[in-house]
Each structure stands twice: as structure tokens, then as C-alpha cells.
Amino acid sequence: MHLSPRQLAAVLCLWSVLFLLPFGRAAELPIVIGALYAIEACVRDPARLRGAQYRLAFLAFAAYWLPELVSAFDSVAPRKSWTEVATDLRYLPFAVFTVDALVLAAARRQLAWWSALLLLFWILDALAQSAFGVGFGGALESDRVSGIFGDDNLKLGPVLAVLAPITVLVALDRYGRAFALAIWALAALAVLLAGARGGWISFAVVTLALLWRVAASPQRFVGGLLLAGVAAAAAIGTSYQLSERFAARVDRTLAAFDGTRGGLETALAYRASIWQTALDMSLAHPFNGVGVRAFRHDYLDHAAADDQWLALNPEQGAFHAHHWVLEVASETGAFGLACWFALWIVLWRHWRALAREQRHGVAAYSIALLAMLFPLNTHFAFYSSFWSNLYFWLLLVWIAQLPPARERLP
């Protein structure tokens, strides 16, 4: 089925969120356009909102937005919190737009294809920057490949790692396992060279999930796991010998095993102090936290005297918790955690109700969300424009892929 120009424009608007992600707040433009379109459409036809996918999208929005609303009433930084509460309202009509834009299977396939091509371009650009010292994002000036994101915005590794399932599974569906394996290898190399250890962990999660997805038996899964392990060891060993910058990051990571607190802090880039402070904030404000986006404003009151972040930034310390569970707990409290976990229980039940072939349609986005939320990792701030845009994009596209309830397993 061919899409009309209007339908293609809607898919293009949705795809543009990914396309503009490396360029700061530019990614807000298609979100606002989509939100305005949805508001106009709902005014014309309010009955359109009765579908199950709309209700699930509203639930996803509520689980994110209600915690910040409740946290804002006694926030330690009320202006910051209420501003965040107001601006995040844009995700509600954008949720409607996303479901509308992807109502047709052809639209969903088109979005996946365009997204896969975009991500492949990011991968090749990152590899070119590593090989030749320059790419579309500029020259290689730091100790990490930055790709299209640029040297002042080192987010390539985590973003590529999270989105890699889209490219790999599109390649698998269109061109077979050999081509998908080649795409996986290129993505792995780009994530490795990007140097973000959080990205490495996310990509490991993605790899395990992809192997489980394509393996026809436990024996094949174990065999694939062994091959992936050998390939990873070879790539890491080669990079360690050829790149002093990469070797330095590996050495910092291995410092975690020297048995000292200092070694652990070095390996975690001093995040252990942030996590302890976030935990203290959560205990001091158990119900609704210190207020959304108020973490930095309350950091000084809870940080230890020898906190490394106070030396780096005496006025505020760390900006966010660097872990999504601790971010939600410290900024929105137990109420926020309850909302987030309730949402994921509901989504898990929806996923469990899908037949095997229906799960294939949501597989790429399921794996991406798993990698994004994997708890044994570090994370960007989820209550921020950059990471929340990607989170909602993945979550809403996942919801839009779901078949009507009558087509699911009883």
C-alpha cells in the first residue's frame, strides 16, 4: 500500500525527531509541529481518541508527567520544576500524533527504513571520523569519536547503542543474516570508538537481546554468544594496542577491581558519590522528591564534604543523578517510582499478550527501550529535553506498533 503525501509528511515529521537529535533543541521543532497537528485534529474529531493505543499512549504520558507535577508543589527549585512541568505537556498531543502517523503498516515500515538508513549514515560517519580525523560533525578533537553529534556533544555512543536494533533488524528483514551481522559489526566498532562506557554496556545488552531474538534454540544462542564474545575480545584487544585513548578508558574501567574506594570512583567517573547523594535526597524527600530538575539545586545539602563534584563545581555539584531509577527517586520520590514501574508492568502485560509474529513488529523498539532503561548502567537525565525526546519517541513508536486488542492472544 502506498502512502499519500499527507501520510508521508506525517512519517517524515516523526522521523525528523531522530534526524535532528544531534542538533540540540532543533529536535523540538517536529515534536511541536506534530503536537499542533494533533491538537487541531482532535478539535475536529474528538472521537478519534477512543482507541486502545491512544489510551496506552495517555497512560505512558501520565506515568512520566504526573510524578513531575506532584514533585513541583514543594520543589526546592519551584521555578525550574514548574517550567519543566509546563514544557513537558507537549508530549501529550505528540503522543496522539505518533499513533495517528503510524496507523498504517506501510507508515511503520517507512519509518523503520528511514531510521535504519539514518543510523547507518551516523555509523559510517563515525568510522570515517575515526579513520580520517574528520566527519560531518567536524574534526576529531577529543579522546572519543563524536560523529555527527560533534566534539562538544559526546552522546554518539549511548545513542547509537540504544538505536542499533532498528538498523540491525531492518537489515535482517530485508537482506538476511549476513548483511545484518555486517551492520552489527560496524555499529559495534562505532560504539566502541565513541568511548562511552555506558554505551558499551547498552550495546552488550542489545547484542544479547538480538542473539536471543534470532537464535532458534538455546544451543544456537550460546554459540552466538561465544562468537560475539570472541569478536568483542578481538576488537577490544586490537583497539587497546592501537589506540592510547581507548587503552586509557579500559584502564580506568579496570580500576574498579583494585579493591579500593578510589579505584571504584575512578572506574565510575566519580558517579558513586552522585549515586550516594541521590539516595540521601530520596530518603530526605521520600514521597515526591526534591522536585523535577531540582537535583542540582539540592546537591550541596546532601553531598559529602569530600565529594569530587563539589571541587569541580562548588556552587552546585553534579547536575543530575546519572541513573534513571535514582533520578526518579530523588526528584519525584516514591510516587514517581510507583508511576514508572506501574507503566512498565502494564507494557509488559501488553507485550506478553502478543503472538510471536506480532512481537517481531515491536522487537527493535522493545530492545532499544530495554537498553535505554537497563539498570546496571549509567544514564542521561530522563527529565531533560534530549533524552526525554528519544525516550518518548521510542516508547510512542512502540505503542503505535501494537495491533488492536482483538488481534492479540486471549
Regions found by a protein language model. Give the residues of each.
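Membrane helix-loop boundary segments at the extracytoplasmic
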Residues: 18-24, 327-332, 363-401
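A membrane-periplasm/extracellular boundary helix in multi-pass inner-membrane enzymes
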Residues: 193, 214-262, 266, 276-284, ...
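Long extracytoplasmic/lumenal interhelical loops at the membrane interface
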Residues: 262-273, 288-332
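Transmembrane signal-anchor hairpin modules in multi-pass inner-membrane enzymes, especially those
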Residues: 1-83, 102-109, 113, 117, ...
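Alpha-helical transmembrane segments of multi-pass inner-membrane proteins
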Residues: 15, 93, 107-141, 149-217, ...
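Perimembrane helix-loop-helix junctions
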Residues: 38-49, 203-228, 354
